[in-house]
Amino acid sequence: NDTEDSTHVRLEGNHGAASNAGITLIGYSGCGKSASLEILLSNYPQVIIHKSESFQRFPQIVYLVVVCPANSNFSALYISIGEEIDKALGNLEPVYEQMVKRARTVGEKANVICKLIEMFAIGCIIFDEIQLLDFSGQKESTYESLLTVVNKTKVAIMAVGTEDAYSKMFPNLRMSRRTGAFIEANAYC
């Protein structure tokens, strides 16, 4: 089912009953988490170009890898997602990064990200070095705001980081259950 506007096609599906998919990969620094991920992702195209019956082309982003900025908040993280969308699409200008930057609050940035996830039917967003994020702050600017994006869009998320990230990300059991499977990479080093 496609809904068209003047410049984009929005892919829609029946994801109302879909459960959140996700995975958390935690391990020692330098144990090969990011390298393993690179090898895995090299087997998949990052973008698939679909063609409609009228020969209109529209991209679907299979996955994004977002390296979390050091000592940053969720506003910076959402801007990084916009930047990675531009890179995946091969944009020479930071179109989607600027779109996210123009949103004033973290909540508005999250809403822009939701629209972009739906517009490009993004399958999975991988957050590497997630321990670098500042998880303190108000509810709107915490990991819970990211989970709200996940709940709205049903995009799968993968969090990759060191053991420090686990206690920051999951202050309670309810939060850890919402992100899916947990893999302790130390067992494979």
Describe each PLM feature range.
Residues N1-D2:
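Trafficking entry modules
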Residues S6-H8, N14-S19, F58, N73-S80, ...:
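Mid-core helix/loop region of P-loop NTP-binding domains shared across ATPases and GTPases
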Residues G16-I39:
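Walker A/P-loop nucleotide-binding motif
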Residues N20-T24, Y63, C124:
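Residue-level preference for the first positions of well-ordered beta-strands
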Residues K33-S34, N73-S75, A165-M169:
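Switch/connector loops and helix/strand junctions flanking conserved nucleotide-binding motifs
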Residues N43-F55, K87-G90:
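Post-Walker A helix-loop "phosphate-sensing" segment adjacent to the P-loop in P-loop NTPases
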Residues I48-P69:
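Conserved catalytic segments around the Walker B and adjacent sensor/switch elements
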Residues M119, G123, D134, E144-C189:
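The catalytic "switch" region of P-loop NTPases
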